[in-house]
């Protein structure tokens, strides 16, 4: 059975009002909280085989913190443009695309 953990991106910055939403980075708090949340997953003895993420900057940066904590190389992260502002059916599509060898993402 596959297990899917849903994690929202860490706190993002609104410092540049003209910046495209897709390109908003994490703010200082986001950079502090993301590794702490990744550690909480590890502390619960949950082993993540892969990370699936939107390519939006704040989501990708958060995913990289989780990848680092779980020793998952960036090359093994699965990135989907279609997850940005995705309705439920796009998440279903991402789930179907998970390779068989991945048990927890």
Residue ranges and their predicted role:
Residues 2-3, 7-86:
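Active-site-proximal alpha-helix that buttresses catalytic centers in soluble enzyme cores
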Residues 82-99:
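Short phosphate-binding loop-to-helix
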Residues 45-47, 98-101:
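Flexible, charged surface loops at secondary-structure boundaries
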Residues 4, 101-105:
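Generic beta-sheet signal
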């Amino acid at each position: 059975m596959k297990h899917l953990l849903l994690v929202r991106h860490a706190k993002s910055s609104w410092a540049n009002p003209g910046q495209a939403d897709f390109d908003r980075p994490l703010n200082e708090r986001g950079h502090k909280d993301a590794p702490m949340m990744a550690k909480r997953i590890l502390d619960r003895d949950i082993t993540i085989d892969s990370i699936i993420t939107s390519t939006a900057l704040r989501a990708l940066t958060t995913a990289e913190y989780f990848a680092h904590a779980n020793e998952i190389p960036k090359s093994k992260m699965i990135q989907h443009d279609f997850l940005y502002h995705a309705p439920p059916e796009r998440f279903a599509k991402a789930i179907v695309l998970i390779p068989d060898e991945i048990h927890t993402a």
